[in-house]
Amino acid sequence: MFLHSPALLIWLFLFCLAGPQAVRTEPYNSTSSSSSPTANDVTSSDLLLLASEETPTRAPKPVTKQGKKNVVKVKKGGNGTVDDSPWVTDCSEPLNKDISCSVNIIGCSDNVFKYVDAGQEPPRAHDVRIAPTTKVMGANRIDKRKHRLHVDVSWQIPQLEASTHLKAFKLIVNGPDGKNTCFVFNVTQTHVDDEGISPRYRFSSNTLFDFGHNYTVTIVSLPMSRKRAPKVSATSLMPDDPDAAPVKIVKTNEQMCEGKSNPQASKWAASFRKIFLFSAIRLIQIEFLAAPPQYCFEEYEVRLLDSSGIVMLQSAIITKDELRTEIINGRPVQFGEFNFTDIELDTDLIPSVIPIESAHDGRCLCVTENGCSCLAADWKPVKLTRIEKPPATSNQTEESDGKAEKDKKEDTTWTWHTYAITGGAIIAILFILSVCAGLKCYKKFNNKKKASNIHLLNENPAFSHSGSIPLILKQSISVLIVYSHDSAQHEAAVLAFAELLRDVFNLNVHLDVWDEDDIEENRAEYINSSIVRANKVIIINSIGAYFRTVFRHQREPAIERITTGRNDVIFDMQCELALQHPCVISCHFSYTNPKYVFFPINRLLQYSIPNSLMTMTTALTEQPARPEQLAGFNQVFARLQAAISRKLNYIESDPQWFENTHHRVATRRVSELEAHNIVPLPPSLEVKVEDEDAFGQMETLPIDELKEKFAAKRDLEVEVLDSEDVKLLEDVKCAPGPIHVEPTEPEVLEPAEEPMEEAEEDEEDEDDVDSVEGQTARIEELQRLIVHKDMNHDSGNLDSAYVSGSDFSADIHNEILDKPRLNAEMDLRKANREDSAFHDEVIGIH
């Protein structure tokens, strides 16, 4: 009756709660065969609890209090024994040194002891209790598992004669999903002085059980017979996880705490966060973690107990309004603070905290089967150590004897002067060594810096720094693009392609659209120089370029756009010279049929844009192309693709676009050209024919007959000229003075042209020339002299020679026709040859 009294049961419950952790287990899949290496590999933070992590507890030790001889020897299948247990922990009570045990994890199918005869079995256990407790984790270790489920399993064995046969207990824990974990308890070392008292056995774990699941605990008394296994079972539902409660509950904390209490509040235990000891001011500062809001606790009582844990020395009440809140790892944590003052030194004290079980309206917050009671959390004993006082020092003055001091100085050869000199010398030596080391390091660093500064810079980022690329890069490659102006969409694609070569691959690209200033200044010079200065020539094949080349080769009427552009004629002039370039690259856009390739370059490798763009770039730069230049989104390359897409859409919408936008143009004859486009010849070079019809019907004579005919005609003209000169002198009457010759019309000067021809024939006879000097030879001589007259002429530049031989000479001819030919001091023969003399006077030849 005494054992079953309510007071004793409450005291026993609190006693069991205050006890330490009995065992720490592995997860459900732990077996006897794998428990030993698993326990050795687990870190101490997983197996052992820190001093500030659990309240109340003390860290388990890896050996029993009795030593190895008390370890249970587990037998497996009768094959032998295992000397070393898989896991042995000290589960003794901190307040009761007489309680001891030894625990092993085994396989559920293992036989610990051999079977005994029937009737030799120990009695089965009774009064099995499963007490789950929700404990908050301390030491600021707030993570996903803010709370820990601590479960205590306790039972008793009846005091019978058969109890002497008891050697061990086998504890089987059946968890969810059919997972089982088994333990064996050695009770052979248990000594009970009073045979009338039945001992109570206790098993606790912090990791074996989970929140919100049903567990069945079966206790088997060992050894057992083949016919009977004395065992007892108990089932318990674990409380819900406080961290997951706010997700499940829709009501607020105030609504949950109105008029009722949480049934799981009696299973919650607090924990200490920090405990500070200040011996100088005799103060102990504690911080404890409060319960979640769903438990509805309104006040907490902090206590300071003596070393026995029974006498309360100090206490205080902390309300929920006085709690502080911190955010740790994204989770709100509430804790309370209190300072215990006037603490006695060198005395063991136990801090404790317990929630107040009643609310302000008097209802019970910790409802239990036997009444209203909350769990108290006790910490391990702490002590304020007394601080020892330093030894006292005397401030009294003493008389000194000069002789004694002198004797002391003589005994000690080292004086403060010696120390000062020695210290100065050492400092000087160290300074000199540091300076020398610094200078040496500086020289070494400077030499390395000079060596590192000698390197070759890659000014063209289009090339990668690979071994196949020369260290000394060439100058930027000049590229000329020759294309036909077929349509606005084709021109846009060519322009985007040129921008891609210029901006992405860093090439010096020349295009007629970009060189319009040079074209307007001198088209012929641009066409010639653009071919000469280009390292590479890119010919873009298209349908318009193909037909223009074919018709020009077959000498058929040309083809051009109905609405011509200012640069449409550039292709016809530039293509002939471009085909003579040593480095010609042929390409076409993807919308152009490969059959429209020029017949002169169809033997070359054809590049399709943009499909063969990287291969074409390698041919242009003569270096390996880098694909990363077009990796990702490139705005210039996207513009090229968009232009090609627009051209494709244009072709699909109008398949007959080329026939609709182009037409054939017949070649115009010279007579059809406008008058202002023809440069007139000087009068002396014009052929004068009196009867054009007769001139056209003239017969061809042999060269001998032609010479005789010209000789007879020359004699006749000389006679006529002499008679006219005499008549002219008679009319003038030989009056003295200068003779002024007025400019006459071309008809008056016609007779004067014959002496010029006669003089030329005389010169031809003297030089033994087979044919008469033509007009073309005279113009070429004039052009040669004009070239030497040009101050800006560069004899080594083909462009300047071309310009001086064509356009500049035409300007000189215009000046000759427009300028009056007057010279009063010239005689009649020079007047007949005024054009030639005028040229000589302009050039400066006398």
Curated annotation (Swiss-Prot):
Known function: Forms a receptor complex together with receptor ilcr-2, which upon activation acts as a modulator of neuronal activity. Binding of the ligand ilc-17.1 to the ilcr-1/2 receptor complex triggers a signaling cascade that activates the downstream signaling components actl-1, pik-1 and nfki-1, and results in increased neuronal activity in RMG interneurons in response to input from oxygen-sensing neurons. This leads to increased animal movement and promotes aggregation behavior.
Consequence of changing residue 487 to F: Defective aggregation behavior
Keywords from the named record: Cell membrane, Glycoprotein, Membrane, Receptor, Signal, Transmembrane, Transmembrane helix
InterPro entries associated with the record: IL-17_rcpt-like, IL17RA/B_FnIII-like_1_sf, SEFIR_dom
Expression tissues: Expressed in most neurons.
Residues annotated as transmembrane: 419-439
Region called Disordered, residue ranges: 388-409, 737-771
Membrane topology category: Single-pass type I membrane protein
Organism the protein comes from: Caenorhabditis elegans
GO biological processes: interleukin-17-mediated signaling pathway; positive regulation of locomotion; response to oxygen levels; sensory processing
Subunit relationships: Component of a heterodimeric receptor complex composed of ilcr-1 and ilcr-2. The receptor complex interacts with actl-1 and ilc-17.1 with the interaction being mediated by ilcr-2.
Domain SEFIR: 476-618
Primary location recorded for the protein, binned into one broad class: membrane
Sugar-modified residues: 29, 79, 186, 214, 339, 395
A Pfam family this chain is assigned to: Ig_ILCR1
GO CC annotations on file: plasma membrane; plasma membrane protein complex; receptor complex
PROSITE patterns: SEFIR
The protein's name: Interleukin cytokine receptor-related protein 1
Subcellular location, record wording: Cell membrane
Acidic residues bias spans: 744-771
Keyword Cell membrane in record: yes
